[in-house]
């Protein structure tokens, strides 16, 4: 091929090569875009921060204000609130009319039914298969294999109830928590 003076020796990109690069770039971009959420799913979130805490909410979705809650509930009362991950969680009023430092996840450890508090028998009784738990959520009759999960209940400075994951030893069994 003859060279014209003043022209550099840079080869032209042919039409076919350009279309191949364009197609490859489009397919690669689409594949990476589709794989991003899959990869993100398998990478655990960074630890630290609030530890997955949630402000307790009442049946209407309003934040629970402890002073208002205690005005409406008697000592020994156990009532449901929305807790961590939206799970139904029992708020417990102690005998000295304070919020207990723990709450109970109301999901039965047998098949996942919500376990109601039975005031007359002073225990939780699962309506699905009859599992029973004492007032602290410890299993006393199966078929449930484990006690109800605990959450830490804390009252904030602005009078709200916050649930955070329970990471200490389970005071009912003296063992590491099974739910962590």
Curated annotation (Swiss-Prot):
Its EC number is 7.1.1.6. Signal peptide: none annotated. GO terms for biological process: photosynthesis. It comes from the Bacteria. Belongs to the Rieske iron-sulfur protein family. Gene3D superfamilies: Rieske [2Fe-2S] iron-sulphur domain, Single helix bin. Residues 66-162 form the Rieske domain. The keyword Translocase applies. This is Cytochrome b6-f complex iron-sulfur subunit. Component of the cytochrome b6-f complex, which mediates electron transfer between photosystem II (PSII) and photosystem I (PSI), cyclic electron flow around PSI, and state transitions. It comes from Thermosynechococcus vestitus (strain NIES-2133 / IAM M-273 / BP-1). SUPFAM superfamilies: ISP domain.
């Amino acid at each position: 091929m003859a060279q014209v003076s003043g022209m550099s020796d840079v080869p032209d990109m042919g039409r076919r090569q350009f279309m191949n690069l364009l197609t490859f770039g489009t397919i690669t971009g689409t594949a990476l875009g589709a794989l991003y959420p899959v990869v993100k799913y398998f990478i655990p979130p960074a630890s630290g921060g609030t530890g997955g805490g949630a402000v307790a909410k009442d049946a209407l979705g309003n934040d629970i204000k402890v002073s208002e809650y205690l005005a409406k509930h008697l000592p020994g009362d156990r009532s449901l609130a929305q807790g961590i991950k939206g799970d139904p969680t029992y708020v417990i009023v102690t005998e000295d009319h304070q919020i207990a430092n723990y709450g109970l996840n109301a999901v039965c450890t047998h098949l996942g039914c919500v376990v109601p508090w039975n005031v007359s028998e002073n225990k939780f009784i699962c309506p699905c298969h009859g599992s029973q738990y004492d007032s602290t959520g410890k299993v006393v009759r199966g078929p449930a294999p484990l006690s109800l999960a605990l959450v830490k209940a804390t009252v904030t400075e602005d009078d709200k109830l916050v649930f955070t994951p329970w990471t200490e030893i389970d005071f009912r069994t003296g063992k590491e928590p099974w739910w962590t």
